[in-house]
Amino acid sequence: MKLNRLFILCAAMLVGVLAQSCCNSGISGENYKFENGMIVFDEPARAAGQESMLGFAAEPIPVVRVGFVGLGQRGPGAVNRFTHIEGVEIKGLCDIEQSNVDKCQKMLKNAGMPEAGSYVGPEAYKELCERDDVDLIYIATDWIHHVPIALYAMEHGKHVAIEVPAAVSVEECWQLVDTSERTRRHCMMLENCVYDFFELTCMNMAHQGVFGEILHAEGAYIHNLSDYWDSYHSNWRLDFNQKHRGDVYATHGFGPVCLALNIHRGNKLNYLVCMDTKSVNGLEKAAAKMGSTEFANGDHTSTLLKTENGQTIEIQHNVYTPRPYNRLYQLTGSKGFANKYPVTGFTFTEGMLKDGVIPEGATLNPHGFASKEIEEAAMAAYKHPIHQEIEEKAKTVGGHGGMDFVMDYRLIYCLQNGLPLDQDVYDAAEWSCIGELSAVSAKHNSMPVAVPDFTRGDWNKLDGVKFHTK
């Protein structure tokens, strides 16, 4: 008996030693390894024949010919918005349901536009991508089909715009980057929140130094989806969340703060840690709708990141509990502060704003929000040039208050004029990879996970974010 106990004890010690050795030596059975207390994902070298897409501008396309794939929830709104953009031809409409295609054909008819080609079925997108009279494929399917469709489109010479998240794994992020670099085709993720009026104005303020040096930023997607789960075809979104841990929908909160911090434009994401709660409401919903007995996604997930330039970022995900809608969007600077949710407001320091923004005799409170009068004056004084150009029409056309139209308008404007896009393939990869990275951190007791450098060392070659105009 004593011998057996001794054998078991020695075996346990050996397992522990081997596990520690694996962590120190970088051995892992996954697509990542453990190095010096950090989880590090594989970063493939750039293949021969590939070139960076930083600052890439394609040849101008005066009339952009578009094919839409995915017409269930987000797709129809995009089709409608495109009918309000000049210099666009809608060549194809694709979905797995004929009724969704028919609905969008009616939109074209009502707008006085020609009927587009109809493509119905799970593989029908391939025929659309193979057409020689299409320049751009606009993808708004369920998440797991984003990358396969985007890769096929780029391989057939098409630029692609992909709904969020662009990819659902680190491997898929690299596939988008490599295919875009090799085919020299734009790959833009359709992150609409970077174009919202408060976010874009605050980005402009941050880049002009109004807040001093940005030290900390926050973003989130907090949206109780209890009234929406039934609207997803075949429960695809609940099914995805049931299978995946981590922040699976980070980009709405994360993208805007990344642009404010000039990520891969003189700054980069270094590592993250993630912690999540157990699943209560998610499991309850999945049990009722799908008979699930387990649910991987925590009801609330929190992720912290550190940047190369010494800033921290916090992002949160919660689509299960009864809370007011909230994307946070918060910038903490050495000389100021901006906050969007749940209360919009600014804190400014004397001497940091343009002359005339602060009314004569007004004072600034370093312990509270500036007055609404000062807030409105600052929003007007630092309105982004893009909004100065298109805000009125955007609010008329709509799409989440107009930001969706600004996004689509800018995409087409840049393609028409042969300009670099506002969001490039590296944004798509950096913002989307948070899903798997956060899941792996949570799985390993909130262990730090290195964020891959999808630019392969070129993160400091561009000097800040720039929205190009002709």
Predicted feature locations:
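N-terminal Rossmann-like dinucleotide-binding module
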Residues: C23-A111
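A structured beta-alpha segment of the ubiquitous adenosine-cofactor-binding alpha/beta core
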Residues: A116-I139
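C-terminal motif of bacterial Sec signal peptides marking the signal peptidase cleavage site
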Residues: L18-S21
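Beta-strand-loop-alpha-helix segment that lines the small-molecule cofactor/substrate pocket
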Residues: L136, D142-W143, V147-Y195, G209
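C-terminal helical cap and adjacent loop that interface with cofactors, partners, or active-site loops
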Residues: G26-A48, L54, P76-G77, C258, ...
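Glycine-rich phosphate/pyrophosphate-binding beta-alpha loops
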Residues: Q316-N326
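Predominantly a Rossmann-like dinucleotide-binding segment in NAD(P)-dependent oxidoreductases
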Residues: T183-M188, C193-A296
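Bacterial N-terminal signal peptides that target proteins for export
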Residues: M1-I8
